[in-house]
Amino acid sequence: KKSEQDKQKAAHDLKEAEKLIHKVAISGNDLSRLKTQTNLLAWLTQDKAKKTKAPNGVELFTVSKEDYLDVINEFSDKTYTMNEALSLLKGPNFNEYEVDAEKSPLYPTENEIHYYKGNDKIVFVGMPLTNKYPQEVEAKDKWKVEGDSIKINVLDAMTKTNISTITLKLNNKDYQGGNQKSKYYVESVKYN
Protein backbone atom coordinates (compact mmCIF):
# COMPACT_ATOMS: atom_id res chain seq x y z
CA LYS A 1 0.00 0.00 0.00
CA LYS A 2 1.38 3.42 -1.01
CA SER A 3 2.00 5.95 1.72
CA GLU A 4 0.44 9.42 1.45
CA GLN A 5 3.91 10.87 0.83
CA ASP A 6 4.55 8.47 -2.08
CA LYS A 7 1.22 9.41 -3.65
CA GLN A 8 2.04 13.11 -3.44
CA LYS A 9 5.52 12.54 -4.84
CA ALA A 10 3.96 10.71 -7.79
CA ALA A 11 1.56 13.63 -8.31
CA HIS A 12 4.46 16.05 -8.88
CA ASP A 13 5.36 17.02 -12.44
CA LEU A 14 8.79 18.63 -12.44
CA LYS A 15 8.44 19.77 -16.07
CA GLU A 16 5.36 21.81 -15.10
CA ALA A 17 7.14 23.11 -12.00
CA GLU A 18 10.11 24.11 -14.15
CA LYS A 19 7.95 26.25 -16.49
CA LEU A 20 6.60 28.22 -13.54
CA ILE A 21 9.83 28.45 -11.56
CA HIS A 22 11.73 30.09 -14.43
CA LYS A 23 9.11 32.85 -14.63
CA VAL A 24 8.92 33.42 -10.86
CA ALA A 25 12.72 33.39 -10.48
CA ILE A 26 12.88 36.45 -12.76
CA SER A 27 9.76 38.37 -11.75
CA GLY A 28 9.04 37.36 -8.17
CA ASN A 29 5.35 37.35 -7.30
CA ASP A 30 4.57 40.90 -6.16
CA LEU A 31 1.24 41.30 -7.96
CA SER A 32 0.73 44.83 -6.58
CA ARG A 33 3.10 46.03 -9.36
CA LEU A 34 0.72 44.87 -12.12
CA LYS A 35 -1.23 48.14 -12.28
CA THR A 36 1.89 50.14 -13.16
CA GLN A 37 4.10 47.61 -14.96
CA THR A 38 2.73 46.17 -18.18
CA ASN A 39 6.07 44.39 -18.69
CA LEU A 40 5.23 42.32 -15.57
CA LEU A 41 1.78 41.56 -17.01
CA ALA A 42 3.44 40.52 -20.30
CA TRP A 43 5.91 38.32 -18.42
CA LEU A 44 3.29 36.55 -16.29
CA THR A 45 0.90 35.97 -19.21
CA GLN A 46 3.54 35.13 -21.85
CA ASP A 47 2.25 31.56 -22.36
CA LYS A 48 -1.40 32.65 -22.67
CA ALA A 49 -1.29 36.00 -24.49
CA LYS A 50 -1.87 36.32 -28.22
CA LYS A 51 0.15 38.91 -30.11
CA THR A 52 -1.45 41.26 -32.63
CA LYS A 53 -0.55 44.62 -34.14
CA ALA A 54 -2.40 47.87 -33.54
CA PRO A 55 -3.20 49.99 -36.64
CA ASN A 56 -0.11 52.09 -35.83
CA GLY A 57 2.12 48.98 -35.87
CA VAL A 58 2.57 48.68 -32.10
CA GLU A 59 2.62 45.07 -30.86
CA LEU A 60 -0.33 44.32 -28.59
CA PHE A 61 -0.77 41.41 -26.20
CA THR A 62 -4.29 40.09 -25.65
CA VAL A 63 -5.27 37.69 -22.88
CA SER A 64 -8.73 36.43 -21.97
CA LYS A 65 -9.95 37.30 -18.48
CA GLU A 66 -10.24 33.53 -17.79
CA ASP A 67 -6.59 32.87 -18.66
CA TYR A 68 -5.58 35.98 -16.71
CA LEU A 69 -7.41 34.68 -13.61
CA ASP A 70 -5.59 31.33 -13.88
CA VAL A 71 -2.22 33.13 -14.12
CA ILE A 72 -2.96 35.34 -11.09
CA ASN A 73 -3.92 32.27 -9.05
CA GLU A 74 -0.75 30.52 -10.25
CA PHE A 75 1.55 33.31 -9.05
CA SER A 76 -0.01 33.87 -5.62
CA ASP A 77 -0.70 31.88 -2.47
CA LYS A 78 -3.99 33.81 -2.17
CA THR A 79 -6.98 32.49 -4.10
CA TYR A 80 -8.38 35.31 -6.23
CA THR A 81 -11.90 35.74 -7.56
CA MET A 82 -12.30 37.29 -11.02
CA ASN A 83 -13.15 40.72 -9.56
CA GLU A 84 -10.17 40.62 -7.19
CA ALA A 85 -7.83 39.61 -10.03
CA LEU A 86 -9.12 42.38 -12.32
CA SER A 87 -8.79 44.94 -9.51
CA LEU A 88 -5.03 44.23 -9.45
CA LEU A 89 -4.87 45.96 -12.85
CA LYS A 90 -6.90 49.01 -11.85
CA GLY A 91 -4.58 51.96 -11.64
CA PRO A 92 -4.11 55.25 -13.49
CA ASN A 93 -3.33 53.38 -16.75
CA PHE A 94 -6.39 51.08 -16.69
CA ASN A 95 -9.40 51.67 -18.95
CA GLU A 96 -12.59 49.64 -19.29
CA TYR A 97 -14.72 49.56 -22.44
CA GLU A 98 -18.13 47.97 -23.01
CA VAL A 99 -17.30 46.76 -26.57
CA ASP A 100 -15.36 43.82 -28.04
CA ALA A 101 -11.61 44.40 -28.34
CA GLU A 102 -11.77 43.98 -32.14
CA LYS A 103 -14.54 46.57 -32.50
CA SER A 104 -12.89 49.30 -30.46
CA PRO A 105 -11.24 52.21 -32.28
CA LEU A 106 -9.19 52.73 -29.10
CA TYR A 107 -6.17 50.61 -28.34
CA PRO A 108 -3.66 50.87 -25.50
CA THR A 109 -0.44 52.80 -25.75
CA GLU A 110 2.69 52.04 -23.73
CA ASN A 111 1.96 51.21 -20.05
CA GLU A 112 -1.82 51.25 -20.60
CA ILE A 113 -4.11 48.30 -19.94
CA HIS A 114 -7.48 48.10 -21.68
CA TYR A 115 -10.21 45.73 -20.54
CA TYR A 116 -12.91 45.11 -23.15
CA LYS A 117 -16.05 43.82 -21.44
CA GLY A 118 -17.72 42.94 -24.75
CA ASN A 119 -15.57 39.83 -25.16
CA ASP A 120 -13.70 39.88 -21.82
CA LYS A 121 -10.25 40.57 -23.24
CA ILE A 122 -7.36 42.34 -21.53
CA VAL A 123 -5.13 44.15 -24.04
CA PHE A 124 -1.80 45.91 -23.43
CA VAL A 125 1.33 46.91 -25.32
CA GLY A 126 3.84 44.09 -25.54
CA MET A 127 7.35 44.42 -24.22
CA PRO A 128 10.25 42.52 -25.74
CA LEU A 129 11.02 39.57 -23.48
CA THR A 130 14.69 38.64 -23.23
CA ASN A 131 16.55 35.60 -21.94
CA LYS A 132 19.43 37.41 -20.27
CA TYR A 133 18.88 37.66 -16.51
CA PRO A 134 21.21 37.94 -13.52
CA GLN A 135 19.51 35.02 -11.77
CA GLU A 136 19.15 31.32 -12.51
CA VAL A 137 17.27 28.37 -11.06
CA GLU A 138 19.24 25.77 -9.10
CA ALA A 139 19.73 22.37 -10.79
CA LYS A 140 16.70 20.05 -10.60
CA ASP A 141 18.56 17.43 -8.57
CA LYS A 142 18.83 20.01 -5.74
CA TRP A 143 15.09 20.72 -5.61
CA LYS A 144 13.47 19.60 -2.34
CA VAL A 145 10.13 17.81 -2.67
CA GLU A 146 8.25 18.00 0.64
CA GLY A 147 4.76 16.48 0.47
CA ASP A 148 2.68 18.63 -1.90
CA SER A 149 5.41 21.32 -2.14
CA ILE A 150 8.72 21.80 -3.95
CA LYS A 151 11.35 24.20 -2.57
CA ILE A 152 13.66 25.61 -5.23
CA ASN A 153 16.60 27.97 -4.79
CA VAL A 154 17.32 30.85 -7.15
CA LEU A 155 20.99 31.70 -7.59
CA ASP A 156 22.96 34.71 -8.74
CA ALA A 157 24.12 33.64 -12.22
CA MET A 158 27.64 35.04 -11.69
CA THR A 159 28.48 34.17 -8.07
CA LYS A 160 26.14 31.14 -7.71
CA THR A 161 25.04 32.44 -4.29
CA ASN A 162 21.47 31.87 -3.17
CA ILE A 163 19.23 34.92 -3.80
CA SER A 164 15.87 33.44 -2.86
CA THR A 165 13.92 30.27 -2.17
CA ILE A 166 10.64 29.73 -3.98
CA THR A 167 8.09 27.24 -2.72
CA LEU A 168 5.68 25.83 -5.31
CA LYS A 169 2.64 23.91 -4.14
CA LEU A 170 0.33 21.51 -5.99
CA ASN A 171 -2.67 23.61 -6.99
CA ASN A 172 -5.73 22.61 -4.99
CA LYS A 173 -7.31 26.07 -5.21
CA ASP A 174 -11.03 26.28 -5.71
CA TYR A 175 -12.15 29.29 -7.76
CA GLN A 176 -14.72 30.04 -10.46
CA GLY A 177 -14.21 31.63 -13.87
CA GLY A 178 -10.83 30.33 -14.93
CA ASN A 179 -9.97 28.45 -18.11
CA GLN A 180 -7.43 25.84 -16.98
CA LYS A 181 -5.99 25.72 -13.48
CA SER A 182 -2.20 25.42 -13.31
CA LYS A 183 -0.53 22.33 -11.84
CA TYR A 184 1.28 24.48 -9.23
CA TYR A 185 0.97 27.83 -7.55
CA VAL A 186 3.62 29.96 -5.85
CA GLU A 187 3.21 29.49 -2.12
CA SER A 188 6.07 31.82 -1.20
CA VAL A 189 9.15 33.69 -2.40
CA LYS A 190 11.67 34.25 0.39
CA TYR A 191 14.58 36.57 -0.41
CA ASN A 192 17.89 36.07 1.41
Predicted regions and their residues:
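Core segments of small alpha/beta cavity-forming domains
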Residues: 7-119
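Acidic, glycine-rich flexible loop segments
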Residues: 116-164, 171
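Short beta-strand edge/turn micro-motifs at domain boundaries
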Residues: 6, 161-192
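Gram-positive cell-envelope targeting signals
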Residues: 1-12, 168
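Low-complexity, compositionally biased segments
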Residues: 9, 16, 33, 50, ...
